[in-house]
Amino acid sequence: MAVQQNKKSPSKRGMHRSHNALNVPGIAVESTTGEIHLRHHISPTGFYRGRKVLKTKAEA
């Protein structure tokens, strides 16, 4: 069984955990519809950067 040689100080423990933080996803608001969507993704209504780029199932 693995056993630590020396106790890790609170400072070193914090440095070790410094990359474990969760990131908030980049959220954007569509300018034409006002809907919230992920950045660089099409909104649920088929708009991207103010232009209609995809027909939704309701329209087809």
UniProtKB/Swiss-Prot annotation:
Highest taxon, organism lineage: Bacteria
GO biological process: translation
Annotated Basic residues bias: 9-19
Annotated stretches, region: Disordered: 1-25
GO cellular component labels: large ribosomal subunit
InterPro entries (alphabetical): Ribosomal_bL32, Ribosomal_bL32_bact, Ribosomal_zn-bd
Family recorded in the similarity comment: Belongs to the bacterial ribosomal protein bL32 family.
Listed name of the protein: Large ribosomal subunit protein bL32
Organism (species): Polaromonas naphthalenivorans (strain CJ2)
Gene transcribed to yield this protein: rpmF
